[in-house]
Amino acid sequence: SIRYNITLDEDFSDEEIWNVLKKVCLDERVKSLDNGLDHELENMGGILSGGEKQRLVLARVLIRDYPILILDEATSALDEKTAIRIENNILADNQLTLIMISHHIQEEIKQQLTECVELKV
């Protein structure tokens, strides 16, 4: 289910799950499913697009409130607008130390970073 894919059977409230789904811009999509959080996923995510699967994995990480995250191409399967919204939501957490690895970092996001290292070949 959506719930299990996020919680991996750990104890999180529905409110925590919905909050993290909103953070990754997946809340409306899950609300549209027949059983919401308890919608059963089949065949490697079945009805979810590649970008939705990527956001589900991101929700699984974010709900655990780790103090340090390393995200490698975490929004690569998303359109630019959605990627920026999610990255802004993640960067809004001032308690989080975040290392982002990306081939395409938007200027709006880059301006919010404490430091940005660009590797050029």
Where are these regions (language model features)?
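ABC ATPase nucleotide-binding domain helical subdomain, centered on the C-loop/LSGGQ "ABC signature"
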Residues: R3-N43, E87-N88
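A short, proline-enriched helix->beta-strand linker immediately N-terminal to the Walker B motif
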Residues: I63-P67
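H-loop (His-switch) and adjacent beta-strand-loop-beta switch element
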Residues: H103-V121
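Walker B catalytic motif
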Residues: M44, E73-A74, L78-T82, I86
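ABC ATPase nucleotide-binding domain "signature" region
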Residues: S49-G50, L56-V61, R85
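ABC ATPase nucleotide-binding domain "signature motif"
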Residues: N35, H39, N43-R55, E80
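Conserved catalytic loops of ABC-family nucleotide-binding domains
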Residues: N89-E108
